[in-house]
Amino acid sequence: DYIMANPPFNLKDWRTDEKLTKDIRWNGYGLPPVGNANYAWILHMLYHLDQTKGVAGFLLSNGALEDEDTLAIREQLIKNDKVEAIFILPREMFYSTDTSVTLWILNQDKKGGLRNGRQLRNRENEVLFVDLRTWNQNNSTIKTDKSKKTFVVFNEEQIKAICDIYYGWQTYTEIEPYDKPELYHAASID
């Protein structure tokens, strides 16, 4: 099964100090902090994925990658080999905010095999990092009642290139590391 989501970023005071402290969704990961719900969303999605082959793709603010209050949960997600890929997107991808965002892909089964007609290699203990912050050349403008807002839009060629990076990594069979400096890097979690 698949989950796609764009949860509210950095939601504060999403629970009281006592509420949900023993929630089953946090088992094995720890309690997400009261001051930011980003990792509550992540663990909620992970809990609801098919445990054998579920995949989730979702957007979060870039701060979720470095928040000290969630370091232990983030480390456990990596240790449990749930994170498949992280795509850092350009600023101003949304017309309503200029917040920097990251596309996360979680995968319950990174083993090789035939998936959706494609032969995938074993990607266990690897995470693909893709830095698209400089891919901000294509802009679109929207008029609101009071002003104009410009935001970044990927064109078809860029979308194809992003898919090629991700799909290429999933099927990569060369001995050399899957790496293009300043664009993408496949990191071992061993």
PLM region spans:
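A conserved structural/catalytic subdomain of Rossmann-like adenosyl-cofactor enzymes
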Residues: 1-190
